[in-house]
Amino acid sequence: MSKFSFNINHQYKKARSGIITTAHGNIRTPAFMPVGTRGTVKAMLPESVAETGADILLGNTYHLMLQPSAERIAKLGGLHKFMNWGKPILTDSGGFQVMSLSKLRKITEEGVSFNSHINGDKYLLTPERSTEIQHLLGSTITMAFDECTPYPATFEEAKTSMQLTTRWAHRSREAFVKRDGYAQFGIIQGSTYEELREQSAKDLIELDFEGYAIGGLAVGEGQELMFKVLDYAPDFLPQNKPRYLMGVGKPADIIGAVSRGVDMFDCVIPTRSGRNGQAFTKYGTVNIRNSKYAEDNDPLEADCLCPACQNYSKAYLHHLVRIGEILGAMLMTWHNLTYFQNLMSRIREYIALGKDFDFTT
């Protein structure tokens, strides 16, 4: 079995392109991970997700621990077998979802106690339990348990939260079962404070994670402030390990983050937007519900190879979405995921050529 490794093949300014080698295959970076929250990328077959060019997808610890349970998935052979996906899977730690429960959860040094949003049952999610769940799922890349610092946060609030994340990172690392081809990423926090981001990175580097994520962004701070943090945060992380910006997926945000040294991304934007009738193209977004597309015989994008563009007109997609047909959500999602994977492919090409990225080529 291959060992987990990251090799940078090309670098242009701060942007890097390379290959992550894992037990479940290679990941070309910069990489975009479609979100498969409950063991499925909504409105897509796993083989269709692979056809879009995706090398890896994301699963959600919080949702899978509730339904059908990590133990059941393990009994059935692990998440890869369960959902028929042979490529790498990264699972988040569940921390972000639990923190977003607000009134339903309580944070202590031990972990987070919360009530299920499904039936009200009480759970305790700790660094050890989160790591165990991800092991039971068979995750290729496990995320350390963290507290996602809310925005805005004062310096003291962000410091207290960051220090808790550091202590939880130690416990997550101790609980992680090391195996060839598998990895665990630590998550740096610190809100929008450079001093805290630097300290968080220093603390986590001591634990020698296989990769590092930048958490606590895309939580309402806006692109300008996010880029300001990304001007320095990736530089605090090891050059020879993958850097993952969690929850970021607007094309302009991805391009800006890649140019600042980020390698991996995930976001629900392409799938959620597709289900809501919004398509991404090189020339901007298309709201297919708009009546101006009712008699438009052209495809969404003439040079796109996805089934929606190769076989159907904007008029047909407009019709499907307006009447709420499931096929509309499927085709729009397929197109958006194809667009995002094509975007990542073009970004990798531009890095290899040593050129600044152009959206429209």
Swiss-Prot record:
Any Gene Ontology CC annotation: cytoplasm
Molecular function per GO: metal ion binding; tRNA-guanosine(34) queuine transglycosylase activity
EC number(s) from the headed UniProt entry: 2.4.2.29
Family matches, as SUPFAM superfamilies: tRNA-guanine transglycosylase (SSF51713)
Binding site for substrate: 92-96, 146, 189, 216
Active site: 92 (proton acceptor), 266 (nucleophile)
Cofactor: record remark: Binds 1 zinc ion per subunit.
Biological processes per GO annotation: queuosine biosynthetic process; tRNA wobble guanine modification; tRNA-guanine transglycosylation
Sequence positions that bind Zn(2+): 304, 306, 309, 335
Recorded superkingdom: Bacteria
NCBIfam families (UniProt xref): Q_tRNA_tgt, tgt_general
HAMAP family linked: Q_tRNA_Tgt
PANTHER family hit by this protein: QUEUINE TRNA-RIBOSYLTRANSFERASE
Role description: Catalyzes the base-exchange of a guanine (G) residue with the queuine precursor 7-aminomethyl-7-deazaguanine (PreQ1) at position 34 (anticodon wobble position) in tRNAs with GU(N) anticodons (tRNA-Asp, -Asn, -His and -Tyr). Catalysis occurs through a double-displacement mechanism. The nucleophile active site attacks the C1' of nucleotide 34 to detach the guanine base from the RNA, forming a covalent enzyme-RNA intermediate. The proton acceptor active site deprotonates the incoming PreQ1, allowing a nucleophilic attack on the C1' of the ribose to form the product.
Quaternary organization: Homodimer. Within each dimer, one monomer is responsible for RNA recognition and catalysis, while the other monomer binds to the replacement base PreQ1.
Name by which UniProt lists this protein: Queuine tRNA-ribosyltransferase
UniProt source species: Rickettsia bellii (strain OSU 85-389)
Originating gene: tgt
